[in-house]
A protein has these predicted regions:
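Compact, glycine-rich, soluble single-domain proteins
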Residues: 11-154
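Short acidic, low-complexity intrinsically disordered linear motifs used
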Residues: 1-10
């Protein structure tokens, strides 16, 4: 992820946490499938994301609850597994989708700046409040499309 803003105290989307039996995960239906998603709802969790993972098991992933609805840019920093990303507005409408490809890791001769500059950015292109990362190929497998609604109410 490229940038990030602080959380406001009145962010109603964080109520999702109170509805889950496990405060670190959320069960969500995406298309016809049920997923167990890790929640990234704090600055540290958003920055960490799925970095360092070698794979993403079927029907799992991560739901990012961003501090505000705006254009979001994600990257595959230290991510070793391809994945799909769904960008959703505050109403749960898919505004953009990407298949994000794993990048080669930073090598010992590469500066941090050069490493970051070579990473591809995946943009929501329109304001998004939520980002869902799921296993690669699930967008196609589930026949998801821009404009489709994902019910985020629990």
């Amino acid at each position: 992820m490229k940038s990030f803003l602080s959380f406001g105290e009145e962010d109603k989307s964080l109520d999702l946490l109170e509805e889950s039996t496990d405060p670190d995960t959320l069960n969500l239906t995406i298309g016809p499938s049920k997923y167990t998603l890790e929640l990234a709802d704090t600055p540290d969790k958003i920055i960490q994301g799925l970095s360092g993972r070698q794979s993403i098991p079927r029907k799992t992933g991560m739901l990012f609850v961003m501090p505000e609805e705006r254009i979001q840019d994600f990257w595959m920093r230290e991510c070793f597994a391809d994945m799909d990303a769904l960008f959703l507005d505050s109403n749960g409408i898919i505004v953009n989708m990407h298949r994000m490809l794993a990048e080669s890791p930073r090598n010992q001769f590469e500066s941090e700046s050069n490493y970051q500059n070579r990473l591809r950015l995946y943009s929501s292109d329109k304001p998004a409040k939520y980002v869902i990362e799921i296993p690669s190929g699930d967008i196609t497998r589930l026949s998801l499309s821009i404009g489709e609604n994902i019910d985020l109410s629990i």
